[in-house]
């Protein structure tokens, strides 16, 4: 007798056999439309990337069915022997990539990784220091409306107004004055190499923990294009999907066994419940890619492409904050063109170039308006763009912003011209040809 005869009704069979296009055409169309957008747009958002087919497969696997509270070998549920393999692969690959002794791959996001560190090391009301959002920090580094700003006492440090770089002497002065329990370095819109050794010296002077949030540059570290903060920090957190180019999520790294135990407990059961095992599998797949020699080549290209894009824009009259970039990202000040960040980002999006509005340090504009845009080269580098293409991208951005400056009420003609050029350019660097 066929096993299919045992279904109580045909709906059970279709539940396991029918594709999304059959069961939910509306959702399938939204996903298909997003695929087309990614294929035909130049992605310059500094926090996004394009993952491999392998990462997509791992994250879309049957591991989504498995609950696995706890850690490998110490689960609260049975049947975890195979997901244990996936998580152990993620952990061991992280340790190898970043040359660290302990790793936690369970945080659902970078924000939750940061929250778990706060839970492990701080008590409500404790003082900590982080780069202010206005200078390129992150909302989890002390923004008043965030958990870190509500539960703790954040002290923000800013970049120097003249050099537009971190003022380490001022950081030390603030640390000596406020005696923080934790000092955070790293941010979401700071494009220069950070002196981790100096930060550790400052932390040691006041008896503080040093935490590095390397969400934006962990991929650069993995590809040997940026100093490794694990050599100096008590704890390092990161996302896994930006330049790192793995499945979307967070990680926590440390070289201290006593702290590792605290972080594990803070993640589970302190801050999260069951880990997302399909996501951890996707992370593991991406981590293996980061261990391969061609990942270093990718990082070299990301950095070289950022330099050429930055220089092209500077030569065309834009101001690049801090004068350039040491990373994948750059903060572009639009005030020389009398254009606001929100208007530029919208017009560029209409032209199939995707970026985000971003405040510049000490910006007088509101957060939803801004005086700048933030650009990153990692996603377009992943699809194969090189120096020639990024020089072209710089010219296309210039064309759109200049058009907007000259005709702020209607930049449609320029947007259409650039959009056609972008579609032609991206067609030479196809992605996900077998997806529908």
Swiss-Prot record:
<keyword id="KW-0554">One-carbon metabolism</keyword>
<feature type="binding site">
    <location>
        <begin position="137"/>
        <end position="139"/>
    </location>
    <ligand>
        <name>(6S)-5,6,7,8-tetrahydrofolate</name>
    </ligand>
</feature>
<dbReference type="GO" id="GO:0035999">
    <property type="term" value="P:tetrahydrofolate interconversion"/>
</dbReference>
<feature type="binding site">
    <location>
        <position position="133"/>
    </location>
    <ligand>
        <name>(6S)-5,6,7,8-tetrahydrofolate</name>
    </ligand>
</feature>
<comment type="similarity">
    <text>Belongs to the SHMT family.</text>
</comment>
<keyword id="KW-0963">Cytoplasm</keyword>
<dbReference type="InterPro" id="IPR015421">
    <property type="entry name" value="PyrdxlP-dep_Trfase_major"/>
</dbReference>
<keyword id="KW-0663">Pyridoxal phosphate</keyword>
<feature type="site" description="Plays an important role in substrate specificity">
    <location>
        <position position="241"/>
    </location>
</feature>
<comment type="function">
    <text>Catalyzes the reversible interconversion of serine and glycine with tetrahydrofolate (THF) serving as the one-carbon carrier. This reaction serves as the major source of one-carbon groups required for the biosynthesis of purines, thymidylate, methionine, and other important biomolecules. Also exhibits THF-independent aldolase activity toward beta-hydroxyamino acids, producing glycine and aldehydes, via a retro-aldol mechanism.</text>
</comment>
<keyword id="KW-0028">Amino-acid biosynthesis</keyword>
<comment type="subunit">
    <text>Homodimer.</text>
</comment>
<dbReference type="GO" id="GO:0030170">
    <property type="term" value="F:pyridoxal phosphate binding"/>
</dbReference>
<dbReference type="GO" id="GO:0004372">
    <property type="term" value="F:glycine hydroxymethyltransferase activity"/>
</dbReference>
<comment type="pathway">
    <text>Amino-acid biosynthesis; glycine biosynthesis; glycine from L-serine: step 1/1.</text>
</comment>
<dbReference type="InterPro" id="IPR015424">
    <property type="entry name" value="PyrdxlP-dep_Trfase"/>
</dbReference>
<dbReference type="InterPro" id="IPR039429">
    <property type="entry name" value="SHMT-like_dom"/>
</dbReference>
<protein>
    <recommendedName>
        <fullName>Serine hydroxymethyltransferase</fullName>
        <ecNumber>2.1.2.1</ecNumber>
    </recommendedName>
</protein>
<dbReference type="InterPro" id="IPR015422">
    <property type="entry name" value="PyrdxlP-dep_Trfase_small"/>
</dbReference>
<dbReference type="InterPro" id="IPR049943">
    <property type="entry name" value="Ser_HO-MeTrfase-like"/>
</dbReference>
<comment type="pathway">
    <text>One-carbon metabolism; tetrahydrofolate interconversion.</text>
</comment>
<dbReference type="InterPro" id="IPR001085">
    <property type="entry name" value="Ser_HO-MeTrfase"/>
</dbReference>
<feature type="modified residue" description="N6-(pyridoxal phosphate)lysine">
    <location>
        <position position="242"/>
    </location>
</feature>
<keyword id="KW-0808">Transferase</keyword>
<dbReference type="GO" id="GO:0019264">
    <property type="term" value="P:glycine biosynthetic process from serine"/>
</dbReference>
<dbReference type="Pfam" id="PF00464">
    <property type="entry name" value="SHMT"/>
</dbReference>
<dbReference type="GO" id="GO:0005829">
    <property type="term" value="C:cytosol"/>
</dbReference>
């Amino acid at each position: 007798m066929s096993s299919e005869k045992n279904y109580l009704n045909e709906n059970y069979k279709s539940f396991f056999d029918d594709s999304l296009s059959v069961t939910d055409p509306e959702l399938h169309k939204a996903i298909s439309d997003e695929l087309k957008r990614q294929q035909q747009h130049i992605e310059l958002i500094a926090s996004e990337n394009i993952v491999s087919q392998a990462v997509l497969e791992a994250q879309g696997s049957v591991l989504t069915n498995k609950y696995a509270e706890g850690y490998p070998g110490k689960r609260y549920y049975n049947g975890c022997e195979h997901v244990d393999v996936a998580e152990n692969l993620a952990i061991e690959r992280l340790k190898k990539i970043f040359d660290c002794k302990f790793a936690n791959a369970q945080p659902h996001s970078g924000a939750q990784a940061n929250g778990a560190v706060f839970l492990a090391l701080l008590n409500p009301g404790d003082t900590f220091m982080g780069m202010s959002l206005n200078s390129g920090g992150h909302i989890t580094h002390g923004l008043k409306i965030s958990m870190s700003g509500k539960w703790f006492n954040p002290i923000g440090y800013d970049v120097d107004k003249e050099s537009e770089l971190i003022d380490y002497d001022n950081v030390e002065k603030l640390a000596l004055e406020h005696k923080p329990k934790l000092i955070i370095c790293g941010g979401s819109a700071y494009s220069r190499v950070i002196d981790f050794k100096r930060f550790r010296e400052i932390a040691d002077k006041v008896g503080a923990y040093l935490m590095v949030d390397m969400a934006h540059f962990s991929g650069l570290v993995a590809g040997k294009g940026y100093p490794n903060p694990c050599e100096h920090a008590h704890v390092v957190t990161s996302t896994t999907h930006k330049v790192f180019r793995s499945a979307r999520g967070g990680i926590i790294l440390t070289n201290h066994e006593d702290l590792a135990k605290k972080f594990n407990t803070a993640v589970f059961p302190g801050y999260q419940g069951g880990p997302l095992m399909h996501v951890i599998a996707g992370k593991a797949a991406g981590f293996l890619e980061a261990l391969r020699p061609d990942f270093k080549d990718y990082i070299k290209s990301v950095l070289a492409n950022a330099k050429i894009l930055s220089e092209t824009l500077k030569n065309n009259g834009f101001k690049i904050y801090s004068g350039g970039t040491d990373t994948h990202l750059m903060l572009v000040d639009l005030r020389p063109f009398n254009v606001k960040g929100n208007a530029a980002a919208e017009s560029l999006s209409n032209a199939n170039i995707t970026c985000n509005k971003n405040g510049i340090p000490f910006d007088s504009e509101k957060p939803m308006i801004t005086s700048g845009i933030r650009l990153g080269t990692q996603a377009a580098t992943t699809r194969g763009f090189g120096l020639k293409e990024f020089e072209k991208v710089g010219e296309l951005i210039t064309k759109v912003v200049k058009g907007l400056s000259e005709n702020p009420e209607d930049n449609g003609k320029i947007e259409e011209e650039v959009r056609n050029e972008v579609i032609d350019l991206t067609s030479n660097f196809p992605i996900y040809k077998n997806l529908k």
